[in-house]
Design a protein with these regions (language model features):
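Alpha-helical architecture
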Residues: 1, 16, 69-72
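Serine/threonine-rich low-complexity intrinsically disordered regions
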Residues: 1-2, 93
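Sec-dependent signal peptide recognition
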Residues: 2-11
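Sec/Tat signal peptide C-region and signal peptidase I cleavage site
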Residues: 15-23
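Outer membrane beta-barrel
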Residues: 23-43, 53-165
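Glycine-centered low-complexity coil/loop motifs and glycine-rich tracts
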Residues: 46-48
């Protein structure tokens, strides 16, 4: 009986889309973290006008990334992140880099980074981008106009408006 429950539980956990992280190194103000996520999903669609073929699509994927930071001095921190998106079916799109940036964070003045990152307009939209599927696609689903991930973007972020909020 226990084996049957375990045999059903393990695949369910793999398909559930769990995200995990592991701290690889943390010493003297230097930190490196490895993280990942696996999602198993299939979309069923209706075919019209007698179209032939499978009426489902495998949209399973895995994401793996590494991020790190180093304390340069008590007020200045360097940080970076790299994240890769791996599609299970890989039929239409090759594996792609989701994030790849490096930057500096100053204690009282915010942070500045450069690379492939989410644009600053996404910060406002991120509060509503919580859906399981197709969330925020109405205006933030592209790699343009700083509304989602984009290449070669320099971003400045400040969380407390220079200590006034």
């Amino acid at each position: 009986m226990k084996r049957k429950v375990l045999a059903m539980l393990v695949p369910a956990l793999l398909v559930a889309g769990a995200a995990n992280a592991a701290e690889i190194y943390n010493k003297n103000g230097n930190k490196v973290e490895l993280y990942g996520k696996m999602v198993g999903e299939r979309i069923l669609t209706d075919r019209e006008n007698g179209e032939k073929g499978d009426n489902s699509q495998d949209t399973s994927y895995a994401r793996v990334g590494v991020k790190g930071e180093t304390q340069i001095n008590p007020e200045l921190t360097g940080y970076g992140q790299f994240e890769l998106d791996l599609e299970a079916s890989n039929r239409h799109n090759p594996d792609q880099t989701r994030l790849a940036y490096a930057g500096l964070s100053y204690k009282d003045f915010g942070s500045f980074d450069y690379g492939r990152n989410v644009g600053v307009a996404y910060d406002a939209e991120a509060f509503t981008d919580m859906f399981v599927e197709w969330g925020g696609d109405s205006w933030a689903g592209t790699d343009l106009f700083m509304t989602n991930r984009t290449n070669g973007v320099a971003t400045y972020r400040n969380t407390d408006f220079f200590g006034m909020v």
